[in-house]
């Protein structure tokens, strides 16, 4: 949620910054609502003061033995007017809050201007894509030939965009997740967490999935007037970030770094017809997520660090990748700046996203009331949150299968994973 001060004191500049990411701010409506808010606030405060004054007069008149019936009647009328004004104020505040919840975060000045992904800016490339002296196969053909990827059974059990893995491919998938967790906890300073896969609506509002992305969620019951019930997590960002909800940390506690390996569940409502083959876009997929809670002055430094942690996984797996900074029109709803890491997939002859690392600033913290108390200060301040994939496990499996394939269809196991595979060096 945006700082209300931006909407009250600098609405024109805020509108321009939001326009750079394709969002049209209704300045006229907001100005009208703000004017109503000011009037209602003054009315409420005036009526409250009058009621307090009349209450004193009643007490004084009673002491003098006077008839206080007229004063009590007047107080009753004031009370009714005050209750009505408070109700109007609450309804208006809810309307303003609803609008605020629909607004994306303000892009940072270092994010390049642009309309869509075609205007993202490449920062670097790492590693050289391998040149094969045979016709490369994609991960679907490789996995099915090794009896490790079973899409037919998944369709029978659940439908499209699901997968059944078996044998050594399933073990390789598990090994990737274990390796990522070990790297982040043993070398990058993260605390491993086990979190719920079902979350409530408050958690989803807190991290920004609601109200905008409700259609992308799997819910345990249909939406009702009372709410949507519980939802399967679209990413571990939701439960991990909600660890900070209504918390006040000491400054010395920061930064806090959390990581978790979870399945993620997405309806992919807006992805009809895209990536229908293979593991690239699934309703259920595994991901190792990284989340940080940091001092506001250090969040952009933390973004570079967190992105580097995701990059290290790719480097250690010897997977060629490129790093891009997203333009304003392609950033996620809550991000103020985002880096994407894209891994090389030989069968597609292109780089594909495997990690997205974002500085959210105080956007989530304001919704969550996630705060810290600066050393020597009495008043707590909002902290900054960051998140990133470290990495998407299924897409990493795709990259390993395709980049480490041999001419006979077998798969060489990356050296750093062999200890997780019982010393196995090849599959097939």
From Swiss-Prot:
Keywords: Aminoacyl-tRNA synthetase, ATP-binding, Cytoplasm, Ligase, Nucleotide-binding, Protein biosynthesis. HAMAP family: Ser_tRNA_synth_type1 (MF_00176). It is an enzyme of class 6 (ligase). The keyword Cytoplasm applies. One of its GO terms (cellular component) is cytoplasm. Its EC number is 6.1.1.11. This is Serine--tRNA ligase. It catalyses: tRNA(Ser) + L-serine + ATP = L-seryl-tRNA(Ser) + AMP + diphosphate + H(+); tRNA(Sec) + L-serine + ATP = L-seryl-tRNA(Sec) + AMP + diphosphate + H(+). Consists of two distinct domains, a catalytic core and a N-terminal extension that is involved in tRNA binding. The lineage of its organism: Bacteria, Pseudomonadati, Pseudomonadota, Gammaproteobacteria, Alteromonadales. It comes from the Bacteria. It is found in: Cytoplasm. Homodimer. The tRNA molecule binds across the dimer. GO terms for biological process: selenocysteine biosynthetic process; seryl-tRNA aminoacylation. Pathway: Aminoacyl-tRNA biosynthesis; selenocysteinyl-tRNA(Sec) biosynthesis; L-seryl-tRNA(Sec) from L-serine and tRNA(Sec): step 1/1. GO terms for molecular function: ATP binding; serine-tRNA ligase activity. Its main location: cytoplasm. The gene is serS. Catalyzes the attachment of serine to tRNA(Ser). Is also able to aminoacylate tRNA(Sec) with serine, to form the misacylated tRNA L-seryl-tRNA(Sec), which will be further converted into selenocysteinyl-tRNA(Sec).
């Amino acid at each position: 949620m945006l700082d209300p001060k931006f909407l009250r004191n600098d609405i024109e500049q805020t509108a321009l910054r939001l326009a750079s990411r394709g969002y049209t701010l209704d300045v006229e409506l907001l100005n009208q609502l703000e004017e109503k808010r000011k009037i209602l606030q003054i009315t409420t405060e005036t009526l409250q003061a009058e009621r307090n004054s009349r209450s004193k007069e009643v007490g004084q008149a009673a002491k003098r033995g006077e008839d206080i019936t007229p004063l009590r009647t007047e107080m009753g009328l004031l009370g009714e007017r005050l209750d009505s004004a408070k109700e109007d104020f609450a309804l208006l505040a809810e309307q303003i809050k609803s609008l605020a919840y629909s607004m994306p975060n303000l892009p940072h000045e270092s994010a390049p201007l642009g309309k869509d992904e075609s205007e993202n800016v490449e920062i670097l490339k790492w590693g050289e894509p391998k040149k094969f002296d045979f016709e490369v196969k994609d991960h679907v053909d490789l996995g099915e030939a090794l009896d490790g990827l079973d899409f037919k059974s998944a369709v029978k059990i659940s439908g499209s965009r699901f997968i059944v893995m078996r044998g050594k491919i399933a073990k390789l998938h598990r090994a990737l997740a274990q390796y990522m967790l070990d790297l982040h906890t043993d070398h990058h300073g993260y605390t491993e967490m086990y979190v719920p896969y079902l979350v409530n609506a408050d958690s989803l509002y807190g991290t920004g999935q609601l109200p905008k992305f409700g259609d992308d969620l799997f819910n345990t019951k249909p939406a009702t007037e009372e709410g949507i019930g519980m939802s399967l997590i679209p990413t571990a960002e939701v439960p991990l970030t909600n660890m900070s909800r209504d918390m006040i940390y000491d400054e010395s506690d920061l930064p806090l770094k959390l990581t978790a390996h979870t399945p993620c569940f997405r309806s992919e409502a807006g992805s009809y017809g895209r990536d229908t083959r293979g593991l690239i876009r699934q309703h259920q997929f595994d991901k190792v997520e990284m989340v940080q809670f940091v001092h506001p002055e250090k969040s952009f430094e933390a973004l570079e660090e967190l992105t580097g942690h995701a990059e290290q996984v790719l480097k250690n797996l010897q997977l060629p990748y490129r790093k891009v900074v997203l333009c304003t029109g392609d950033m996620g709803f809550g991000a103020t700046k985002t880096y994407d890491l894209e891994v090389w997939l030989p069968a597609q002859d292109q780089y594909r996203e495997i990690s997205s690392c974002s500085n959210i600033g105080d956007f989530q913290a304001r919704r969550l009331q996630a705060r810290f108390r600066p050393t020597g200060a009495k008043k707590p301040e909002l902290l900054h949150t960051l998140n990133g994939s470290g990495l998407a496990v299924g897409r990493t499996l795709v990259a390993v299968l395709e980049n480490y394939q041999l001419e006979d269809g077998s798969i060489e196991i990356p050296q750093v994973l062999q200890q997780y595979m019982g010393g196995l060096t090849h599959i097939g």
